[in-house]
Amino acid sequence: MGISFSIPFDPCVNKVSQWLDMKVSYTHNLEKNLAALEKTMKELKAKRDDLERRLKREEARGLQRLSEFQVWLDSVATVEDIIITLLRDRNVEIQRLCLCRFCSKSLTRSYRYGKSVFLRLREVEKLKGEVFGVITEQASTSAFEERPLQPTIVGQDTMLDKAGKHLMEDGVGIMGMYGMGGVGKTTLLTQLYNMFNKDKCGFDIGIWVVVSQEFHVEKVQDEIAQKLGLGGDEWTQKDKSQKGICLYNILREKSFVLFLDDIWEKVDLAEIGVPDPRTKKGRKLAFTTRSQEVCARMGVEHPMEVQCLEENVAFDLFQKKVGQTTLGSDPGIPQLARIVAKKCCGLPLALNVIGETMSCKRTIQEWRHAIHVLNSYAAEFIGMEDKVLPLLKYSYDNLKGEQVKSSLLYCALYPEDAKILKEDLIEHWICEEIIDGSEGIEKAEDKGYEIIGCLVRASLLMEWDDGDGRRAVCMHDVVREMALWIASELGIQKEAFIVRAGVGVREIPKIKNWNVVRRMSLMENKIHHLVGSYECMELTTLLLGKREYGSIRSQLKTISSEFFNCMPKLAVLDLSHNKSLFELPEEISNLVSLKYLNLLYTEISHLPKGIQELKKIIHLNLEYTRKLESITGISSLHNLKVLKLFRSRLPWDLNTVKELETLEHLEILTTTIDPRAKQFLSSHRLLSHSRLLEIYGSSVSSLNRHLESLSVSTDKLREFQIKSCSISEIKMGGICNFLSLVDVNIFNCEGLRELTFLIFAPKIRSLSVWHAKDLEDIINEEKACEGEESGILPFPELNFLTLHDLPKLKKIYWRPLPFLCLEEINIRECPNLRKLPLDSTSGKQGENGCIIRNKDSRWFEGVKWADEATKKRFLPSCQLISLK
């Protein structure tokens, strides 16, 4: 019998047949698949757009998008780009097919294209089918953010250790620390906060809130909400009760430590929305106050008293402030120094202030005089007025001249814990004639900065920087109380200095004798209407506006015609940030002594009819008056020296320019103009007084010619901004005329290829360039090496450099620069910028050296450093930034 074989041939044929059918279907069904792909992609895009609108609403409420949803959005964006390419080639590919779509003139190419269409169709269908019930979550925040701290007070280490251990005890939910003003409670609480920041101690989040004397529940709620990532319109529209419920529901799920600094009365935690820290582990509250009674009302059984320093410890602190040079300048001074230190009663604030005041007193006679002055203000009863204020008043009395003293008292007009812009203070001082401005505003400003420096060095003011180059000062609350006490003639004439700033009052306070009121501050309040007439015959300052960093917007709407009738000495009137104020009464003409008028961020459209009678006015602020249509009548203000029009909507017609050119005493002008405002750009007089100039608008052929004239027209220009202009280059020349320029901001300028003109600004401190898609160089080598420019080394004083969305930028400078003052380089979306003009010696040196920031870690990996030493110097200071 022969051997036979059976081969299963049919299944193989079947599989091959299926494979061939699938390949043929890619081409045969191409048109149907393309139509389905286009339709399904439209549906996917509609779904994405709906979800993105929902995402925008939820992110406005402080929520953050889920990573899963972001991956989906990225996938949709990726597949959309691919499909755009596929659909672009559809006609070519369809024409390539033949034999009823079963074959192709290029079979391989058609197969690949058809397969890609088929696979993308399946991918789009899958993306479209994904369901998102939730796309956001509660925004995550850093657990703790370290707070800036003054140097540790000598002798507080033991108390800090004790407070930290006490707060961490299982049975302690609330810890209160009390003591007199200036004893170091805030410093101790800050050290405690930073200690928790370092160790975390198992808590999810730490929250710091300054409460201050005028306690407002919603203010505390808003600060806690900000830390929790809440915000937007939905939050601000909630009432106090709703905010409390919202905070409670979030905090009850977290372990937290809440630090409340400077409370003056019982704080109702339930009303704020803070779960009771005593009811569950993982919740802690630490606060400071001046009153032991407040501790008891807050439910603290064993409050910690922050006591003044013991005599020997206090003397150690005092000696450090005085310095060994002064202590050793005469054999008798150390013994007298111990007597002076003893008069400070161990109060750290007084020891610091008096010690620094005495640091330059190097004769026995000066020290004996100091003891005599301190003894002349004996303390007779417990409290601020009998112990702290007389001591602080000695530092006040020791200030040189009434000018510096009056300047300090003026700072007390601002709200408690206020950050006060230095330039605002100085403007007020000049117009109140505390500083003589007769020799020019710039000289007067220099004097103002000298006074501020004197007060800072005397520890009566503290400097504060907002990180954006705008410097401010703040006043310790004890020093502020001292200033108010002195201004009211040691409490005898309390109505001379009326300060109700930032406390939420809704009407003008009731005053027994308006004739004694000299200065009044009602800034950052809720007063809607000023009605009636008040006989304020001695009133020189009236503040009804808001600070730059104020938290409460002024709400003034109307001023009655008779309100200004009896204020013949009023020199300073601040109505800034009253965004519901549309006009001023004609009777403002009665303010015959007015020198300063601030209408910043108001809604006025015209100057009041009585403006021409204000013959003494020297300072007029109309910045951000977005409805301003005319300044007719301003030519009557013959003594006007400072006019601020930045970001106002004033139309720059010929009449406006002519009227301004008649102001013969004008020294400082800030303004925003459209390049089409040829009349302004052609005015040598106005350009020569420009301190801040912003050019905004579209391209004009004459813009460069006017910019060239600008370079020879002004030596006062400090801030220069060009925004949304189409211009190939900025032609400026003349190094001698840009010595004052410190801030340059260029935004959204099409066609701009280089900024070589910046070599003529040797004092520039901040340079920001955003959205200049054609920019290739900051300083162009070829242009910079032409003529006189070849010997100039740019940016010797530059502090901050920001470069954002400059896709063609390749070079900042062609070789390393010293950059001796450079603190920060912020770079975003500059893919072709791979080499920085740095070597190992560039940038600000020391512990707080130059920082380089970018949002993309791959950019750092691609940087071409000058050498290994440069890489070693700067790579550790490179920081990733996250954009919300």
UniProtKB/Swiss-Prot annotation:
Name of the protein in its database record: Probable disease resistance protein At1g63360
Superkingdom, taxonomy of origin: Eukaryota
GO molecular function per UniProt: ADP binding; ATP binding
Isomerase recorded as keyword: no
Matches recorded under Pfam families: LRR_14, NB-ARC, WH_DRP
GO biological process, one term: defense response
Domain remarks in the Swiss-Prot or TrEMBL record: The LRR repeats probably act as specificity determinant of pathogen recognition.
Amino acids binding ATP: 179-186
